[in-house]
C-alpha cells in the first residue's frame, strides 16, 4: 500500500498528447499494472469519470491543462472539465487498453449511506451516475427564475480537504463558502448583489497538513484576489519551493499548488457587488486577507438593505444535507 506521489519522477509515465495537445502523465505503477481497480464516490458533475485517473493519479504536467478558473465546473450538463478529461481518457485507453481499468462508482443517498453502485467501464458508469443524478436533481437555473439583491447562506465546518483535520479560514470562506456552496450565486446574484456568508471564522490553522495556506491568506490575498493573476504568477514559485514539496511527499501535507487552485472560487467576486462574512469569532483574521465582515447576519442584512434601497430582494439559500452534516 502506498500513496500516489505526483512529484516522484521515477514512478510517473508519460503517455503522450491528445489531439488537442493535452499532455497525459500518470502514476507508472497504476498504469502498468495488469488491472487497475478504482473506487470512487460520485457527488456532483465535478467528480467521477476520468477525473479519478487523470487527476487522482496524475502529475501537474497533466493537471495544468484543466485545473483553471474557467474550466473547473460542477455542472451535470456540458462540463468542459470532463470534456478534457474524457479526451485524455481516450488516450489512456489507446495506450493502456480498454480492459485494464475497472471503475467502481458509488452515489450516496445521504452523507452516511450508499444509495447506488455501478461497476465497469469508466465512461459507462459515469453516464449511469449522471443519468440518475439528473432524475433526482434539478438544474440550478430551473430552481429559481429570478435574481436577488442580497444572497445569504451559512457555511458548515465541512470540506473534502479537511477530513481528519480542522477547517481554516481559507477553506471556510473561499473553498467551501464561495466554491462548493457558491453554485447558486451564479444563478441568483445580480452584478450588484451583496453575498453574505455566515461562518464563525477564527484564527485556526493546521500548518502541518496545509503548510502554505496561511501564507497565501496573509501575503497574497491582501495584494490580489484575482485567481487568474495568482495562477499565472505563483505556480512556478511554489513548484520551486523544495521545502513544501518535501512536506507533500514525505509528511502528509497538501501539495503547495493545492491552495493556488483553491483560489479559483474568488472569480465570483467579479460577478457580484460585495462579499460580507458574518459572525466571525475573530474578525482580524478576515482583515489580514482583506475581506469585509460584520458581527452578525442581522447586521449584514441591515447594511445590505440600506445599500440596495427600497424594494430590496433577499434570498436565503438552504443547502442539502451533504453540506450540513455533523459528527
Please name every model-derived segment.
Residues 49-70, 169-180, 216-219:
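A short, gly/pro- and small-residue-rich
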